[in-house]
Each structure stands twice: as structure tokens, then as C-alpha cells.
Amino acid sequence: MKNNKKVGTEDSTKWMLESVEIDPKGDSSVKQPESTINSNNPESSGAGGGILKNVSKNLAVGSIIRSMSVNKWRKSGNLGSPSTRKSGNLGPPLPVSQVKRPGPQRVERTTSSAARGLQSLRFLDRTVTGRERDSWRSIENRFNQFAVDGRLPKDKFGVCIGMGDTLEFAAKVYEALGRRRQIKTENGIDKEQLKLFWEDMIKKDLDCRLQIFFDMCDKDGDGKLTEEEVKEVIVLSASANRLVNLKKNAASYASLIMEELDPNEQGYIEMWQLEVLLTGIVSNADSHKVVRKSQQLTRAMIPKRYRTPTSKYVVVTAELMYEHWKKIWVVTLWLAVNVVLFMWKYEEFTTSPLYNITGRCLCAAKGTAEILKLNMALILVPVLRRTLTFLRSTFLNHLIPFDDNINFHKLIAVAIAVISLLHTALHMLCNYPRLSSCPYNFYSDYAGNLLGAKQPTYLGLMLTPVSVTGVLMIIFMGISFTLAMHYFRRNIVKLPIPFNRLAGFNSFWYAHHLLVIAYALLIIHGYILIIEKPWYQKTTWMYVAIPMVLYASERLFSRVQEHNHRVHIIKAIVYSGNVLALYMTKPQGFKYKSGMYMFVKCPDISKFEWHPFSITSAPGDEYLSVHIRALGDWTSELRNRFAETCEPHQKSKPSPNDLIRMETRARGANPHVEESQALFPRIFIKGPYGAPAQSYQKFDILLLIGLGIGATPFISILKDMLNNLKPGIPKTGQKYEGSVGGESLGGSSVYGGSSVNGGGSVNGGGSVSGGGRKFPQRAYFYWVTREQASFEWFKGVMDDIAVYDKTNVIEMHNYLTSMYEAGDARSALIAMVQKLQHAKNGVDIVSESRIRTHFARPNWRKVFSELSNKHETSRIGVFYCGSPTLVRPLKSLCQEFSLESSTRFTFHKENF
């Protein structure tokens, strides 16, 4: 880009690139403007971005550095010779004679390119950025806390400035700032020197921050980076971001950087080369800012229906009713039935003779008793898994919110707890005292015919079978309900020994079986009454009979059919991160949809415990698979049992982060399969059962969000969609040689056979498969995890999506939260290596798959904004599985963008 404006002494102190000549072949020069250099390929995070669609574009940074030459330079005064870099004032620019030398020449940033691209390069967390001046007070306090004799040692520098979780990286920054300021830091620094360091780190001057980063890499301060120095910084960055695998391969990645930036094999690279690479890394993301700003500006225009508080309230209420109408009418019906039953029984006892003694207490007690019977019956309905799974496939699925069955179960449980306590209190604190203390003649006139001629005492009333069974019910239900609470069931409550056994899934599971006794006591309590009635007026058993029979039949059916639930293990993989993947034979007649789950039992661990896990295999696979995270006692023991029988994936001794694998043959492929299975824990399954994710086919656009192991229900969905896209796979869903573990879909069958070529055409997004099933047009999968090793769980699936999804139907976004977000100095060099490595061979250095990995956490508002603008007037199904902390923000964003745009987001979450 040419600029003929005369430069004065008051001009910016930045170097300005006049023109760049690019010589693609090395023997000719073609002039290219700066805008061309910076208009690089948009970086896709999805499947399209997973494979190199144009390697030459992705390698643009390296090719520019190799072939560019500089014609004209302007004075900047910021960057001088290596000798002047060490001081605070970086000195005058090099003379023209010194600038013109053979080989690659310095390319300085311009306001339009690198100034935008590098504006996010920072040494502090984003939470501190923008509040640096205010943060100095906290730093002063920490200095006073950690300083020894008025000087802060190097090992406390990171803690003092807010980089306490990356002390090693902070120490390198400390050394670089000391060299830059020519301060001897061996014995620590005082407060004034600390303030100088802090001011250097927070300067808005891009050159200053880049210079600090270069000085941190340039350990000997000679102005040149050797391969060993680059390797050292890569190791440092990998440690700061907890990337163990990247740390192992630091030498090869350093060699890759030198290969790209040092084509003449001089043995070093210079600051300007590093700067150009940094600019190329981040400038792509900047190219979309104008579009995003215009979208935000459009969103800022307030719709007419929002301009008054009343109209806004009406619109929001209407939207909420539209979104949750099924839940609203079911809960309303439930409340109405409870109110009607209460009022009916209340009015009935206003005419009872006992009303003259007890007053309204008796009426209220009988009213609560009636609705307690109803709710003790209803609470069993949401846990009739087989029945609900069947009903999901009927027209009732359009009327009843089966996805909220667990929430409705919890709602009724809360109602039962409140009603039971109220019913008990009315009897013990009102009815019994009045009956036992009223005048005898009063008692004889109104209660003698019903309760007997002898007036009972309070203790006598408390010792009646009705009272005893009622109190026992309260005790059993109280224990069961308490241990079912989230804090106990998830073992969040840390109780002292030996009470620690009262928390966890096992306690929840066994305590719930106390309710069998509670139901028996309920029937006795409702049959042996103080006031005698004929049997047909004792209605408690009538309420609970049908739900109890249905529940008992489901449990009994599972026990009777248990011999058919035995499966054989095809393969088991124990991953680092305490994750066990089980691949097992599929029982005959076991039909399921993607998104469903099943129960798994290991009798060798416990004969009675069944645990639910999402199915990760596709319906068309000949095998079943589940991925189990070892969190509790049972899952940890299961993982350990299989780990004992596993063999290392490689012959060499594996490191703690390597995979451990065990493989067996499936039934039919090995005549001695029963003998081989004797080595491994026995596994039984039952199911499948319906889950919210199975309704994904109702939507044309999917947004799948999984946190950690919460990705499991969506892996089955992605495999099913990929089955529809992959050539040579039958679309009827009968046989599918899918990926097992980390193996590719294109590999051999898990049974040792060749892949099956099925009929049916390869369909694009949103088409109907050969089997008549409708598939979504697009699927966006966001997988957020905090451990690099987690990507190994579904590496094969990610690679297959990158290879076979030619039309970008599936777009994957992997996020690693242990890494510092893009623009942070602690992850800057890793971003460079990621770009170069992916451009070279199409493999991501973080996930070691073909799908690019993003740093830190997603900006969910940005995700929803982009989808709403990309898919206007569409219905997007948002499916989430993971930590409950993200449920409320995602649900709020769905409601917000459904109101403010023409796109409608429908939120679903798993209920495990």
C-alpha cells in the first residue's frame, strides 16, 4: 500500500510498510498491496476448517515471509538495534544501509493490519484488562505481603501481579523485563521497580508488548531467536496451558517454526519475522469485526413492540407461554386436580360431628390426606421408564413434556414432603389435643359414636396404628428425600467419617428402596383408621394400585429378562482422565435412537446396582458403546476392573497419559468367546430409554453443547448423521462398520470383516435417508473440556467428520478451557504452532485430530448471535448435556434471541 503523505517529526512512531513485493517462484517479483497480505483465508472451526481445503492459503504467512522484500520504509523510532533494545528507550531506527541486507527483510505493522491483529496480545487475564490502574492497589498489598526486606523475589512475582497459576511463565516475563530495564533482579525488585514492570506490561503500545514477548523468548538478548530458545518457550507455554502432549513434541514444533521462518537456514529468526507470523495468526479473526458490529448495531435498534413496559411484558409472557406451553398445562392440570380434591374433602368433613370439636383442623387434615394419596400415586409415573419410552413414540409426545419427567418427579416429591408435614402437624398439634382435652360431655355428644365411649388421651391417640404408621412413613420418606438431594447424591457434602458413606449415588440408590416400606405403611395407614369405614370408602389403595403394579411389573420384567441382558465385550479402552469406553455386542432386538441411554450393571461389583449411561454408538452400528467417567465408587471400581485386564496400546511401557487398551473378539467371530469373556467383568444392560436428545430429528438446525463427558449423547447423533453422509454405508440402519475408540470409520470392522457397502444415495444436509428418516440440515457441535486428553475419547469420530463431511453438514468446535484465550502471551506461540502444523499436515496440535481446537471458553452470546443471523426464520434445537451451572445462561440466551430475532431457539437438556 502506497502512501505519499510527507512524514513529519510529529508523526506516529511506528514503522509503516510502503510496499511489499512477493516472489512466489523466487525469481520474479509481483507487487502486492498490504490489504492482499492481510486478507487471509477465513479460518473455519468446523469440519470444513478441519481439513485443509487450500494448503497454499493456510501457508500464506510462511510464503510471504520467505519471499517478501521491502522497497521503502518510514521512520518509526520504536525498534532499533539489538543493543538499544535492552534499555527502556529503544533507540533510533537502523540506517538504510543497515536495513538493506540479503534475505528476508523487516516488515513492520501498519495501523490497518497488525495494529488490529495484535491489539489483544497481552500478559494479563482479560478480567484484569481495562482495570489495570485499579489493580495496582491489589498488587501493592500483595507486594507488602510477600516482600522480604522491601524487595520482591522472583518466585513471588507471578503471585503478586496475578499470574499465580503460571509461575514459571511469570518468571520468564520477570527476567525479560529486568533485561529490558537493565535492572539487576537476582536479589529481587523494590516497589518502584515493580511498578515499572507493571506499567510495561499494561502499556497500550503494541510494539512495547511485542518487544517484551520477544525479549522473553530471546534469553541471551542478542536480538535473535535460535531453535533451542523457541523450543524452550514452547515448553514453557505448554506447561502454562497444561498441554502435556505438546510439551513432549516441543522440539519438532520448534523445528517447524524455524523451517517456516528461517528458509535460508541461518540458524535464527528475528523479531520482525515473529511479528509477521503473529499478525497472520490473529488477523483472520479480525476480518469479521465489521460484520459483527453491523449485526450488533441492528440488534441495538429496539423493536416497536418493546418500546413500552406493558408491551414488552406482554411479548415476553407470550413467548414464555409458547415455549413452555406443555409444561404449563400439565402443571396447571396437576394443581387444579389437587385443589379440587382438597376442597371436596374439606367440604365433606364440615358436616362431620367431629367438626364441632376439632373445627377446621380436621377438614384441612382430611383434605391434605386426599391430595397426598393422589401424589403418592403420581410420583411413580415419571419413573416408569419403559412406559414413557413407548409413549414418546405416540401422539402424546406432542402434548406431554416427557423430557421433564425427572423435574415433575422432583416437583411432586416436594409437594409430598410439604403435604405430609402439614397433615402430621394438623393431627398432632390440633386434632389430637382438642379430642383429648375437650369436656367429656362434649366428646360424648359429637365423637362418642365414632371413636368409642371412652375419651382417649393424647398419648393414646399417638400410639394408635394410624399414628405409628404415619410417623414411620415420615421418617422413611425423610431419609429417602434427604439423600436424594443434589448435594448428597452428587457427594458435594463432605461428611466426616463414618458419616461420609451417607453421601453419594449408592446412598441415594439404596435409600430410595426404603420407599417400598413407605408404600406398605401408606396402605396400612389408609386402611386401619381411627374412624371406622366400609372397605370401599378406604380409597388409599385405589389411588396407588395401578402405578404400583406398573412400576413393579417393569422391575419384575427386568429381573426375569436379565439373562437376555448379558453382553460380550468387544473392546474396552481405559483413557487418561478416568474414562472407560466399553464396546459390546448388541442383543437381538435391541433397537434405539441416537440420544437414548441404557442402564449398565456389573454383578461382580454389585448385584443390584444399575447405572444410566448415554449410548455413544449409532443405531446402525452392529455394536453398542458407552463412555463412562469414573466419578463415584461404582464407576471407579468398574474402571479399575477393566484396567487390570487391559494391555498397553504400544509395546513400550506407556506413560501416564498414554492409552491403555484391551481387545476381544465378538460372538461368532471367535468360537472360544465364552472362555475369553471369563477374563473380564460381566456386563448386563437394560434399555434403551428415552431422553431429550432423541428428538433431534425434529429440527433442521442443531446446536449441540457438551461439557466434558456430557458430549456422549451427541456423539451418537453425529455418528448417525455421518452414517447418512458417508458413501458405502447402508441408510437403513442395519449394519454399519463405524469407528471403535480412536479407530477410523474407514478402517476394518470391529468383527474383523470388511466394510459393508449398502444401498441408498449419499444425501446432502437436511435430506431424507434411504430408510425414510429425516436428518437435520446442519449440526453445530460445541465440545468444551478442560483436559487435553479428553479429545482422545472421540478422536476417530472427529477425524471421520473432517474426512467424509464434504458439504459441511456437521461443524465441530472444540474448546480447551485449560488454555489461555487467544491473544494471551501465554498461548501466543502455541497459536503459531497450531496454525503452521495444521497448514502442513491438517492435524491439530492440541486435539491431535483434524478438527481445530479453540482456546479457553466459548462466547455463547456470540455463538447465538451468529446462528440467528446465519439461519433466519429457522427453528434451532439447542441440546445441552453437562454441568447444571450452564443451564440457566443457555436457556436465557435461547429466550432472548428467540424474542429479538426471527430465529427460534428451543432448549433441551439431559436429566441424569
Curated annotation (Swiss-Prot):
Residues 1-51, 73-112 are annotated as: Disordered. Residues 205-240 form the EF-hand domain. It is an enzyme of class 1 (oxidoreductase). GO terms for molecular function: calcium ion binding; oxidoreductase activity, acting on NAD(P)H, oxygen as acceptor; peroxidase activity. It holds the Pfam family NADPH_Ox. Residues 147-155 are annotated as: EF-hand-like 1. It is a multi-pass membrane protein. Its EC number is 1.11.1.-, 1.6.3.-. The modification Phosphoserine is found at S294. It is found in: Membrane. PROSITE patterns: EF_HAND_1 (PS00018), EF_HAND_2 (PS50222), FAD_FR (PS51384). The keyword NAD does not apply. Residues 366-523 form the Ferric oxidoreductase domain. Its main location: membrane. SUPFAM superfamilies: EF-hand, Ferredoxin reductase-like, C-terminal NADP-linked domain, Riboflavin synthase domain-like. Monomer and homodimer. This is Putative respiratory burst oxidase homolog protein J. The gene is RBOHJ.
